[in-house]
Design a protein with these regions (language model features):
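Sequence-structural signature of mature extracellular/luminal beta-sheet repeat domains
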Residues: 2-14, 24-232
Length: 232
């Protein structure tokens, strides 16, 4: 290739690249980690300061979900599963390649996900109004879809105790509109339940919240923290 031809080709490629600054910015944003903790985050209670991880960064793994929810990590497979509620699907991110693919579609407008003590996937499904478990062979077992003969609202989020019991919130967001499920009448109050998967025994552990949502146990499991997203 002559020097003049080479220069023209190079200049053309550079011009084409320069004409797409949006793609460049998006790629740079995806690759550039953000220092953690973000200086824009204000700590109100000084007791929280000890939980900061100073020598860490935040990296964007995926852009393209309408509403990403319920991430759950599978360390044995080196992948992350999460729900994309309005798109009615679950996605999987692979650590080795960074590739994101569809894990389950339709997902019954899945929301929260967790792993039980045996490592199986537990999922709160809005549209089917149930709590399910994905078995090792990929089949799905319905753990609970009714309480006292009435349909659950739309299970939202969950946590698993070391005794194997499954605690989940049922605020009903998935039946309030057709955006994250399908609109339907409420048959039960917005409760938080404890399910023993071995005996199928169910207990209402909280019935005085407007919209119980995310929940987690304290490290010693003597307390459970529940977010009431219905409180202004």
């Amino acid at each position: 290739m002559e020097r003049r031809t080479f220069m023209n080709v190079t200049a053309g490629a550079a011009t084409a690249f320069a004409l797409n600054p949006l793609a460049l910015a998006q790629e740079q944003a995806r690759k550039t980690p953000v220092l953690y903790p973000d200086p824009a985050v204000e700590i109100i209670d000084p007791r929280f300061a000890k939980y900061k991880v100073g020598n860490a960064a935040v990296e964007r793994l995926y852009t393209g979900a309408r509403w990403a929810e319920g991430p759950v990590w599978f360390g044995d497979g080196r992948f992350l599963l999460f729900s994309d509620i309005p798109n009615n699907r679950m996605l999987r991110w692979l650590e080795d390649t960074g590739e994101v693919s569809v894990f389950r579609s339709p997902s019954n407008y899945s929301n929260g996900n967790y792993r039980d003590r045996q490592g199986r996937l537990l999922t709160c499904e809005h549209d089917s109004r149930r709590l399910t478990r994905t078995e090792y062979d990929g089949t799905i077992t319905v753990l609970m879809d009714r309480f006292q003969g009435k349909k659950l609202n739309a299970p939202n989020d969950l946590a698993v105790h070391s005794d194997g019991s499954i605690w989940f919130s049922d605020p009903g967001y998935g039946i309030m509109s057709n955006y994250e499920g399908h609109k339907a009448p409420f048959e039960l109050p917005a409760n938080v339940y404890r399910l023993d998967p071995n005996t199928a025994a169910v207990t209402v552990v909280a019935d005085d919240m407007d919209k119980p949502n995310g929940l987690c146990f304290s490290p010693d499991e003597k307390k459970i923290y529940i977010v009431d997203s219905g409180v202004p």
